[in-house]
Amino acid sequence: MYTLYAIWSRPSDADIDAFEAHYTKTHAPLASVVPNMRRFMTTRTTDGLAGGDPAFYRVAEMAFDSKEALEHAEESEQWAQVRADAGQMIERYNVTMSVAIGSTDQDNGGAL
């Protein structure tokens, strides 16, 4: 698997409800229909290790069969819509989004 992680910073307290409404009702549904995607998951972080604050607020995981499958998805209209919406969210809610991409190791019950 080849996985893209979109890692969002925390919006201000005043913007959290609006950010969540937009993320769950608009952004995630747009992202969920990107072609060639094998799996789409989102997480809203609430806790950090040992009770600390989490280092980020939201994480989206988009898994593809290969780097080439992701590259093909990046050429789609759906991808363009997700990118445009992410840019609008960054501006509107004064957040950042970092992206990490790479091959996914799978542990099938043994050591990696």
Protein language model annotation of sequence segments:
Residues 1-112:
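Macromolecular interaction modules
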